């Protein structure tokens, strides 16, 4: 199966995977997860070839098989947006955010209405942020939305204690933006940015097939 994946023979790899499941050599949950990754890989290949209809179908299939797989959900949402079905895109992303918040999901959710005002975006995103409200990703997203709306005190409140309890490059960069927006000295802003340079990057996922790390 790995050889097939290396050759981008996603159909063959999925057939091998199904054979392993039927033979009892693989647990069903592992099969679902790996099949979703293969479907996602196929979707990316199709996107590169410019076959948008097939890409949407493959991406939606991948999302149904494994709703916690972030890239599949994003591709499925992009497919719905291209079809003029923004409500379906929002449902896919909201469901996935409820399983595992991730910045790529927020970016895809923003793309549903790219020209909205910061205030309108803050309101629309509430359907997303009410899922997993105490997750660090949700807290950072709320902070970003308030920064865009130039409500810096609320942006700082949204971050909570993340910069001390769970500092990442992103949360520290957000704190720098909050300080700058609040009128802090340049030295204070630089201090936060300096800390961000050496902080952990945040969530990543590892492809089961290519073993590459993706942010």
Model-derived features: where do they sit?
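Repeat-based scaffolding regions
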Residues: 1-215
């Amino acid at each position: 199966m790995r050889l097939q994946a290396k050759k981008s023979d996603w159909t063959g790899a999925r057939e091998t995977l199904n054979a392993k499941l039927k033979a009892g050599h693989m647990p069903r949950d592992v099969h679902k997860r790996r099949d979703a990754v293969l479907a996602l890989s196929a979707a990316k290949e199709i996107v590169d070839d410019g076959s948008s209809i097939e890409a949407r179908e493959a991406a939606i299939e991948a999302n149904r098989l494994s709703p916690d797989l972030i890239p599949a959900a994003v591709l499925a949402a992009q497919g719905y947006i291209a079809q003029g079905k923004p409500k379906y895109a929002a449902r896919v992303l909201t469901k996935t955010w409820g399983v595992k918040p991730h910045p790529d999901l927020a970016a895809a959710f923003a793309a549903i209405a790219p020209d909205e005002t910061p205030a309108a975006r803050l309101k629309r995103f509430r359907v997303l942020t009410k899922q997993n409200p105490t997750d660090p990703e949700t807290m950072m997203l709320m902070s970003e939305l308030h920064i865009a709306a130039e409500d810096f005190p609320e942006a700082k409140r949204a971050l909570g204690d993340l910069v001390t309890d769970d500092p990442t490059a992103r949360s520290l960069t957000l704190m720098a933006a909050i300080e700058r927006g609040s009128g802090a000295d340049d030295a204070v802003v630089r201090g936060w940015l300096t800390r961000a340079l050496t902080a952990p990057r945040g969530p990543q996922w590892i492809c089961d097939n290519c073993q590459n790390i993706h942010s």
